[in-house]
Amino acid sequence: MACAVLIVAAGRGTRAGGAVPKQYHRLGGESVLRRTLLRFAECAAIDVIQVVTHPDDAPLYEQAVAGLTKVLPQVAGGATRQQSVRAGLEALAAYGPERVLVQDGARPFTPPEVIARAIAALDGNTAAIPVLPVTDTIKHVDAAGHVTGTVDRAMLRAVQTPQAFRFAELLAAHRAAADARVADLTDDASVMEWAGHTVATFAGDSENVKLTSAEDLARAARMLADLPDVRTGTGFDVHAFGPGDHVMLGGVAIPFDRGLDGHSDADVGLHALTDAVLGALADGDIGAHFPPSDPQWKGATSDRFLAFAIERVRERGGIVAHLDLTLICEAPKVGPHRDAIRAEIARICDLPLGRVSVKATTTEKLGFTGRREGIAAMASATIRLPLEIGA
């Protein structure tokens, strides 16, 4: 096995406050720990993930790891971080990884680039840690709170996780420290330093913050709120031809020797777009909001349906990023009306024309559209919503 990850999540997180440990606080609908896990589960270079937890957190932990296939059975942590890491390493020994990354459970924003740099840093090194330059001035302060001097920060670095190690060497160092009753080492690089190994460094990232206090959690919530929740919905609709002298497509009346049968004006294009927008919102479908059993929608113009769906997006503080519509029929010919359809959809939705795409195709005379029995449409809608922050 090439690379394992050991995530330390056994702490109680008392400084963060709240009813649950900090690693189980929810950010954007997911726990901090799950967000941390996902960063590594999505990395192809990671084979397995071992999480060290507190026994009292079992129900919370099961929610955090639900559906994640790389995660091994949890291991109970010890009284200190050093003991917890040792327990996780002993459990991983059965899998024989060549490399191991040790990560804080409350560090949910680790960029993929940092993970890649951690793994690569072990090419030629036994231990490597992500660091950042110290930008604040550092002062020595005595017990009375008085400044006694200024530290030269040129050679100082702030240390993050994931810290990267050759697995066998890290396990041996932890065992040796335990045998020597050395129990005050605050990170795994310190354990390796104590054991006589050289620890290399690589670039960390300012976004790779550890959440320790209630203020950290609030800051993380604000950071997530600034990120858009991008969603895509799809829609599909079909209407058969019936008596008439025109068809409504995308809000445009196109002269034809037949019409389209439907409870409303049977605008197959606008119906598909409406369902696509509602689908992106997870807000039902056109039939749920405008049931054909309701006589008030008999003969209704379908621009009302699409405008309603667009307004639902805006009520939630979102925007429509793009609408894409494909009309499927042998006749009438859509090409001569394409620009008018795009313009009408843009008008209904109050969107720039560049955010609306309209295409047409045939089924090469196959199926009901090929037999000129009706028209089909499929659509997609991309929307951006503010990310909802969970409790």
UniProtKB/Swiss-Prot annotation:
Highest taxon above the source species: Bacteria
Keyword Lyase: yes
Region entry 2-C-methyl-D-erythritol 2,4-cyclodiphosphate synthase, spans: 231-391
SUPFAM superfamilies given in the database record: IpsF-like (SSF69765), Nucleotide-diphospho-sugar transferases (SSF53448)
Site (Transition state stabilizer): R15, K22, H263, T362
Keywords: Isoprene biosynthesis, Lyase, Metal-binding, Multifunctional enzyme, Nucleotidyltransferase, Transferase
Pfam families: IspD (PF01128), YgbB (PF02542)
InterPro entries: IspD, IspD/F, IspD/TarI, MECDP_synthase, MECDP_synthase_CS, MECDP_synthase_sf, Nucleotide-diphossugar_trans
Similarity section: In the N-terminal section; belongs to the IspD/TarI cytidylyltransferase family. IspD subfamily. In the C-terminal section; belongs to the IspF family.
Protein name per its UniProtKB record: Bifunctional enzyme IspD/IspF
Gene: ispDF
